[in-house]
Structure formats: structure tokens, C-alpha cells
């Protein structure tokens, strides 16, 4: 019996090839798009989930109630971690996590620039980075013990056993020996922690000088609480710790007008759940992704799948009119309601199976291109994940039940006598069809509006004046074994006579996100005239203002003609306002026991992303603070040739360093990569949603025209023109699209208004965006309808009325 249902279902699908293709192709596209978008969201939401003790691990951060506003920071002073563990038995393990004074690694004749991180021994007890070979109990037991990843072992040692081998790492001009005690398995690509080598935190730069200093924050701290200890309980204990170790800072903050929060505190030590750091703006370890984006991907995938389901439902209901006699005869012959439902549901099952198979094939073929376009690191293996398989099966069953079950249930309710006559109650069916079409175009209009607003915001970020000229400036990370000051001096001299090179300077901070992935800044705090001052700190070299085209408002720039400029600073406008001086030139700033003189004030420029407000900035030229980047301004014509000149010179100056130069405008664009990716996904989702909606609209319009063939013929005989016929067929559908636009407008405004709040600098949503989006939706719908209505209007009325 069931085989007979499937045979009939197959024949019906084969008989109505165009409708079958529209439904199967639309569903296949929807399945493929939903799967790819869901894989992206799954990857983002799976970050750091592989750690066994993830629920008990937290990152510490400060929240401070300054008079100038709230400040949050995840960087900690060196003595905090050991003091906290000694004070609180609820802390089972604690580790500091920082960069290293070393990066250049040497073994025999190999010298490589590797990612070296400094941690405490508890790190490998807290986090799940399994040891594949070597000492798994105390891998960092001795000061000069190190743990390397499998990838690092292969790069350094090839086929040799790395355990017990001695390697050297360079600090300044000297090399220090380390012993490999263990090899850790390579971390997955959904790990917030990345490293090639783990060494003891005692090798952190400036450790010896700052190990007892509480006012210099330069690394991150993670704690693992004992089982049963909640985050809130831990945070209730930390005020006593703050009052014990930060007495001077609390006094200074109160003196400057800091007001306590609801908890009565002006400075708090809080805990961020480790599984949230990938999505947190607080953490420096996380990628600063957004759960909003991940959830939006799931929402968009649901939208696309729902729109395809609506097409299926509407087409099934519409086709029931052409199959009314078949339904009636089956009822007369004794077919039960459940049998009719089984037959129609069987057709839906066949369509869904075909669509799923085709959709999986499309997703598999498009995955490499999808990864490239949207900067994803997904693999085909993710398709074999039990969670993904369950998601696909659940989606398949829901689609089949909804898209096939509802039309089958509706058709089975039709009156037997009326169906035999070929007459069906169209009122309720049309209401359902119209309601579903409205929902369909609400979702499509939402995606169109959101796409336009996201693109506007990104273009605003890209084109907003930054206070410096990012065009034609090359950013070159120094790296390598050479002293950074020496590398800068040699490259400057080497490029001095190149006509394509306009100026060369150095800095310890990149702008934007370079090819080396760095985008860090430094913070300093000090007292000035009994007032606490906090400022970002930037080490620059001579000609920085010239190279970056930054405006000097007052005073003078650093100059080699003045030998004492190494004891001077340049400040930005925001820093000048924080000092509270009408004329800050000549003011003396006391920092780490050194008096620094304000030489000049520069116009504010955005050295950080536009997500954040302009902050105070102090710039210094101090040879004992190494530079990490070289900035080179080049002639505006033939930029590739200029880059080749720089590359050739760099290879001569620093042959062992990797050439990772990039243009500053590229760096700033990378800063907004996630927004760019979101806009691309929105656009792709909008295009797919409109495409699938229009496929359904096309088919529904065709069925509506078939039902009204004789009416159209009679109207033509009575003198109706082609535009009148087109208007007759199109107006009801266009009205539904207009209703959808009206519904979508406030929803889109609310969603995008909240999204824009994550940017300090943002656009204002203009009314014309909604008008233009509505016009686009109406025009696309009208063109889709016209493809069929014009054809019907031009048809010979004799053909339409022949059966009469």
C-alpha cells in the first residue's frame, strides 16, 4: 500500500516537472545555505568547549569606577596571581599568561621566529592540552623547562625525538638554553589560546623588575575554582583583596572623585567565564567575536529554510486545485483521511529527500569557496560531527512534517462532492497562502534592510577621517634576531636614496591588524598634581608625525637636533584635556621615577578601532624601549613596485626575519573583518531569501493565472489592455509585499539600532533606507509577476475560452 503511494507521488512529481524543480531546487538551496551558515555558527560557539574543566575556569579582570567614567581591563600586575592563590583556598589553580621576552628560537643550524608564551605550571593542569610524549606530570617543573606543540616539534626537530633536547631562545643580544620536557598535542582551531612553545612565567619580559610592582599591568590571569564554588561567591570575596593590596590606588581614585557602584565599590576584581572570552571585549586572549553574529547566522539559516518551506506549502495548496477531481474520486472510492494524508506526505518526503541530497552536495562543493569568501576555518570533517548530523536530521524532519504535513491535512478536509465537481473552498486556503507569503517577504525585507545598514556602517568606518593618512604607508613587523633599533637604522639608511620612499619611522604598536596578527596597546598610570592620570603609551621614532601625516597643534615634534628629546613626550588633545592645563607645553610628567617634559600636542587620531572612544595617548622616543614595527611612507604611484623595493632592502638588512609587510589601509580594514563578514553573509542571505521567495511567487502566480485563465480571456474579449491584465494579476500580490515591508521596517530598525550601539562612532539610520529597501522588494516582486502575467495577457483569448 505504501509503495503504491510512493509510486503515485513519484508520477505526480514527474508530471508537474516545473513545480517539482522549483520546490526541489528551492529547498536544496535552502538546505545548503542553512547548513553552511549553521556550520559557521557551530564553529564560533564551540570555541574553548574542548577543555575538561571549562565550567570552573575564569579570567580575572578589573572594573573601575573613575570620575571620568567606567574602565574595564583584563591585564594584571605580576604579583597578583601568587597573592590571590595564597589568600583564597577556593582557588584550586591559577596561571598567568603572557608573551615572552623570547621569540627567536635556535636549534643546531635552524633559527625560527616562533610563538612563545609564558605561563605558570598550573596552566597545563587547568587547560586540556594533552601531553603526547614526555613528562605529563610536571612538564614545567624547572625554570628552564619548556613544552612544545607537535607542529613545533616537527618544524624544529624533523624526525628526531625532541624530549631532552636543548634549544636556545634569544633575548636582546644573548641566547638562553631551554630543555624540552614534553610535547603537547596541537590545539584545535577553535582554541582561544595559541602557542608554539610554553615556558615558565619567570621568563616574561620585565619579570625581574616588576615582580613586586602592583601598578604595572601587562599580562592576563586565569583561575580554576574548586568544585562547587560559584562565580558570584568568588567575586564577593575579592573586595577584601582589593582593599588589602590596592590601598594607594583606592585613595587616589577617591581623591579624584570616583563614585562607588551599587555594591559600594570603586574598584572590583571580577571573573569572566572562560567559555565567554572568545566573545568578550574585555579579554585580550579572545578573538573579540560576537555571539550576536553567531546567533544571527542561525536566525538567517532559519529564515532561508522557513521561506523554502513556505514555498512548498503554498505550491502544495495551490496544486490541490488542479488535483481536486483526483482527491474527490479517491474519497468516493473509499480513501480514508489518513490515506490521503499519507499520499501527500509521501510526495513531500520524496521532495525533501531529493532536496536534502542535492543540498548536501551543493554544500560540499561550495564549502571551499565559502571558507575563502567568509574567512572561515571549517573543514569537511565538521559534517561528520554527531551534533551536525542530528541538526541536519532534525531540520529534515521538521521541514518534511511542516511543509508536507500541513498541505496534506488541509487537502484531506475538502468536501467529497465539491472536490468531485472540481470545486474547492479557496477562501481559507488563500488566506493561509497570503499569510505565509507576507511572512516570507517580511523575512526577505528584513535581510535587505539589514544588509543596507551594515554596508553603510562599514563604509562609514572605512571612510571616516582617522586623524592620520593611512594611504601609501607600509607597516613592517621587525622580528628576527637583529636588535630592533639597529634594524630600523639600517633600513632607514638603505632606503634613504630610494626615490619611491618618502619617510621611515618606527613604533612599538601597529595600527589596525597587520599580517602578524598583532593589534596591542600599552597603558600607563601616574599622578599629576594630585590627580590620577591614565594614558595609552606609544613608543615612536623620529619622523613618526611626518610618516603618518599627523597634525601638530602646538609645540614641536621630536628632533635629532635636541639631545634631551628622549626625556620628552608628545601628547594628544584628549590627554591634554585630562591634564587640565590650558597650555600643557613644558609640563613635567613623573613616570617610573623619570621626569618627562611635554614638547608638543598633536591632533587626536584613532590609534584604536572605531568601536571605542578616542583615548588619552602619550608618545615617547626612548631607545631603551624597543620598536616592533617600521612604518614607511611611499610614493602614491605603483605601490607594488614600492613594496618590492622595501622587500629587497629588508632581505639585505635582516635576512633571517620573515617579511610580513602590509599597507596600513589593509590593516584598518582587517580590524573590521567581522563586520565585513557579517555584511557579506547578510547580503548572501538576502539574495538567497529573495531568490527563493521569487521562485515561490513565480509558481504561485502561474497557478493563479491558470485558475483565472477564462476570466483573463473574457476580459480581453471585452477590451482589457495588457497593462490592465498585468495589474489585475499583480496587484494583490504586490499589496502583500507592501504589507510585509511595513511589518519588517520597525523590526529591522530595532535590530540594527541595537547592533549599532556596539560602535562608539556610528551612522544614524535614515528613513530612505527603508523606502529604498521596500522599493527594491516591490520591483523584484513585480518583475517576477510580470514574467507570467504579461505572457497571460498576450495569450489569444480564443485559446483560453476554447473549452466553452
Regions found by a protein language model. Give the residues of each.
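Hydrophobic, regular-secondary-structure patches
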Residues: 44, 53-112, 122, 151-159, ...
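Interfacial "coupling" helices/loops that link adjacent transmembrane helices in transporter permeases
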Residues: 16, 308-349, 696-734, 788, ...
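Membrane-proximal juxtamembrane linkers immediately C-terminal to transmembrane helices
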Residues: 35-63, 89, 130, 192, ...
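Mid-to-C-terminal secondary-structure elements
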Residues: 120-133, 146-289, 490-674
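Small-residue-rich transmembrane alpha-helices
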Residues: 32, 36-39, 270, 349-414, ...
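Alpha-helical transmembrane segments of integral membrane proteins
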Residues: 1-21, 283-286, 316-353, 364-485, ...
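Membrane-helix entry/capping segments
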Residues: 1-6, 11, 15, 19, ...
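Hydrophobic alpha-helical transmembrane segments of multi-pass inner-membrane transport and secretion
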Residues: 15-41, 289-325, 352-353, 432-457, ...
Amino acid at each position: 500500500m505504501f509503495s503504491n503511494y510512493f509510486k503515485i507521488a513519484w508520477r505526480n512529481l514527474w508530471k508537474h516537472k516545473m513545480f517539482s524543480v522549483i520546490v526541489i531546487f528551492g529547498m536544496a538551496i535552502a538546505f545548503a545555505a542553512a547548513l553552511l551558515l549553521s556550520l559557521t555558527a557551530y564553529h564560533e560557539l564551540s570555541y574553548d568547549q574542548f577543555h575538561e574543566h571549562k565550567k570552573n575556569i575564569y579570567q580575572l579582570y578589573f572594573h573601575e569606577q573613575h570620575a571620568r567614567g567606567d574602565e574595564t581591563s583584563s591585564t594584571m600586575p605580576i604579583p597578583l596571581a601568587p597573592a590571590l592563590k595564597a589568600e583564597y583556598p577556593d582557588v584550586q589553580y591559577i596561571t598567568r599568561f603572557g608573551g615572552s621576552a623570547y621569540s627567536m628560537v635556535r636549534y643546531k643550524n635552524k633559527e625560527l621566529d616562533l610563538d612563545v608564551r609564558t605561563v605558570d605550571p598550573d596552566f597545563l593542569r587547568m587547560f586540556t592540552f594533552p601531553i603526547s610524549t614526555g613528562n605529563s606530570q610536571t612538564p614545567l617543573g624547572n625554570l628552564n623547562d619548556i613544552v612544545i606543540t607537535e607542529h613545533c616539534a616537527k618544524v624544529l626537530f624533523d624526525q628526531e625525538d625532541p624530549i631532552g633536547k636543548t634549544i636556545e631562545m634569544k633575548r636582546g643580544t644573548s641566547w638562553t638554553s631551554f630543555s624540552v620536557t614534553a610535547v603537547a598535542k596541537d590545539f584545535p582551531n577553535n582554541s582561544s589560546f595559541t602557542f608554539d612553545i610554553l615556558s615558565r612565567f619567570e621568563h616574561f619580559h620585565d619579570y625581574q623588575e616588576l615582580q613586586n610592582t602592583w601598578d604595572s599591568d601587562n599580562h592576563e590571569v586565569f583561575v580554576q575554582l574548586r568544585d562547587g564554588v560559584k562565580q558570584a561567591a568568588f567575586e564577593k570575596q575579592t573586595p577584601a583583596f582589593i582593599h588589602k593590596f590596592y590601598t594607594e590606588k583606592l585613595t587616589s581614585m577617591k581623591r579624584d572623585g570616583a563614585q562607588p557602584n551599587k555594591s559600594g565599590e570603586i574598584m572590583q576584581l571580577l571573573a569572566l567565564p572562560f567559555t565567554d572570552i572568545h566573545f568578550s571585549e574585555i579579554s585580550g586572549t579572545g578573538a573579540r567575536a560576537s555571539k550576536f553574529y553567531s546567533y544571527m547566522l542561525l536566525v538567517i539559516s532559519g529564515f532561508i529554510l522557513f521561506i523554502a518551506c513556505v514555498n512548498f506549502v503554498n505550491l502544495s495548496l495551490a496544486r490541490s486545485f488542479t488535483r481536486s477531481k483526483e482527491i474527490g474520486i479517491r474519497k468516493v472510492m473509499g480513501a480514508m483521511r489518513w490515506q490521503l494524508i499519507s499520499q501527500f506526505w509521501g510526495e513531500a518526503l520524496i521532495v525533501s529527500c531529493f532536496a536534502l541530497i542535492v543540498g548536501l552536495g551543493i554544500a560540499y562543493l561550495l564549502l571551499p569557496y565559502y571558507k575563502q569568501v567568509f574567512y572561515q576555518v571549517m573543514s569537511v570533517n565538521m559534517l561528520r560531527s554527531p551534533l551536525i548530523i542530528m541538526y541536519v536530521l532534525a531540520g529534515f524532519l521538521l521541514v518534511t512534517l511542516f511543509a508536507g504535513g500541513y498541505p496534506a491535512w488541509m487537502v484531506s478536509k475538502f468536501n467529497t462532492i465539491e472536490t468531485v465537481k472540481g470545486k474547492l473552498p479557496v477562501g481559507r486556503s488563500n488566506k493561509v497562502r497570503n499569510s505565509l507569503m507576507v511572512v516570507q517577504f517580511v523575512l526577505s525585507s528584513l535581510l535587505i534592510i539589514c544588509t543596507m545598514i551594515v554596508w553603510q556602517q562599514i563604509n562609514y568606518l572605512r571612510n571616516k577621517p582617522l586623524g592620520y593618512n593611512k594611504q601609501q604607508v607600509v607597516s613592517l613587523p621587525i622580528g628576527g634576531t637583529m636588535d630592533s633599533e639597529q634594524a630600523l637604522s639600517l633600513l632607514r639608511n638603505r632606503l634613504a636614496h630610494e626615490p619611491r620612499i618618502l619617510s621611515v619611522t618606527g613604533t612599538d604598536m601597529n595600527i589596525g591588524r597587520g599580517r602578524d596578527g598583532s593589534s596591542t596597546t600599552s597603558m600607563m598610570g601616574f599622578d599629576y598634581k594630585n590627580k590620577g592620570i591614565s594614558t595609552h603609551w606609544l613608543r615612536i621614532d623620529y619622523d613618526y608625525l611626518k610618516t603618518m601625516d599627523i597634525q601638530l597643534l602646538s609645540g614641536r615634534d621630536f628632533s635629532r637636533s635636541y639631545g634631551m628629546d628622549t626625556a620628552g613626550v608628545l601628547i594628544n588633545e584628549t590627554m591634554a584635556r585630562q591634564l587640565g592645563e590650558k597650555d600643557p607645553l613644558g609640563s613635567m610628567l613623573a613616570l617610573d621615577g623619570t621626569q618627562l617634559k611635554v614638547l608638543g600636542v598633536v591632533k587626536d587620531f584613532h590609534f584604536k578601532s572605531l568601536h571605542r572612544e578616542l583615548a588619552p595617548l602619550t608618545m615617547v622616543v626612548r631607545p631603551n624601549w624597543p620598536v616592533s614595527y617600521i612604518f614607511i611612507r611611499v610614493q602614491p604611484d605603483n605601490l607594488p613596485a614600492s613594496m618590492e623595493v622595501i622587500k629587497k632592502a629588508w632581505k639585505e638588512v635582516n635576512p633571517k626575519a620573515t617579511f610580513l609587510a602590509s599597507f596600513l589601509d589593509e590593516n584598518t580594514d582587517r580590524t573590521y573583518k567581522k563586520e565585513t563578514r557579517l555584511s557579506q553573509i547578510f547580503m548572501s542571505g538576502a539574495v538567497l531569501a529573495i531568490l527563493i521567495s521569487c521562485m515561490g511567487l513565480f509558481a504561485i502566480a502561474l497557478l493563479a493565472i491558470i485558475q483565472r485563465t477564462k476570466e483573463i480571456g473574457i476580459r480581453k474579449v471585452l477590451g482589457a489592455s495588457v497593462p490592465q491584465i498585468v495589474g489585475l494579476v499583480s496587484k494583490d500580490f504586490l499589496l502583500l509585499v507592501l504589507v510585509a515591508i511595513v511589518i519588517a521596517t520597525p523590526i529591522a530598525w530595532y535590530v540594527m539600532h541595537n547592533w549599532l550601539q556596539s560602535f562608539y562612532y556610528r551612522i544614524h539610520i535614515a528613513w530612505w533606507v527603508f523606502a529604498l529597501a521596500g522599493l527594491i522588494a516591490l520591483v523584484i516582486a513585480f518583475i517576477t509577476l510580470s514574467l507570467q502575467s504579461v505572457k497571460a495577457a498576450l495569450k489569444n483569448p480564443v485559446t483560453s475560452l476554447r473549452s466553452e
